[in-house]
Amino acid sequence: MDKKRSSLKGSLLLLLLLVSDLLLCKSVASLPICPSGAVNCQVSLRELFDRAVILSHYIHNLSSEMFNEFDKRYAQGRGFVTKAINSCHTSSLSTPEDKEQAQQIHHEDLLNLILRVLRSWNDPLYHLVSEVRGMQEAPEAILSKAIEIEEQNRRLLEGMEKIVGQVQPRIKENEVYSVWSGLPSLQMADEDSRLFAFYNLLHCLRRDSHKIDNYLKLLKCRIVYDSNC
């Protein structure tokens, strides 16, 4: 009996910690960088990075959950996992594949790369939401996550623009991004082809959100803590 009580207490404690962490992410993610109507609002670089790291991690978690839910609901028995994943539309941006590669890139270049990846997802995320809404019996769990990711991607982009403005204030970065042309694939009449297009897009979103999450943690350590972390 004591062992069961101990196990139950441990499970409840873990659940409380997970809920607390989720509420923290949602709270921080919902805060604008500056309050509406604020004049000469100044936010420290450290605080900007703190928010960006929490937000990027939140987006990656949502992306992973959405991919897993889509896979479970639509991909089972269709052989999607055995198909070669098509090249992601952001592949042309030559993002580093791991931490070791990212460490070789100058921080200003890595910051601008993050901006480009985030901008490259504005259009596909907008259309992802609209196309999921149009799906027969659109699952609320997937739709709500798509809506949330689209909104938080905009917030993260806003925060990253402020970070770049503080790190390299004299340089105006061109709004370079990779163009997405996958909308026709999401609207195909053939169900298998259409669902695989969704599967591929969600796979790419999970991949890119994971990269951004890792890049931001590396940059926070390098810029805010002078690599002493």
UniProtKB/Swiss-Prot annotation:
It is found in: Secreted. The keyword Glycoprotein applies. Glycans are attached at N61. Its main location: secreted. GO terms for biological process: cell surface receptor signaling pathway; female pregnancy; lactation; mammary gland development; positive regulation of lactation; positive regulation of receptor signaling pathway via JAK-STAT; response to nutrient levels. Gene3D superfamilies: 1.20.1250.10. Disulfide bonds join C34-C41, C88-C204, C221-C229. Keywords: Disulfide bond, Glycoprotein, Hormone, Lactation, Phosphoprotein, Secreted, Signal. One of its GO terms (molecular function) is prolactin receptor binding. The modification Phosphoserine is found at S56, S64, S120. Residues 1-30 form the signal peptide. Belongs to the somatotropin/prolactin family. Prolactin acts primarily on the mammary gland by promoting lactation. This is Prolactin. It comes from Equus caballus (Horse). The gene is PRL.
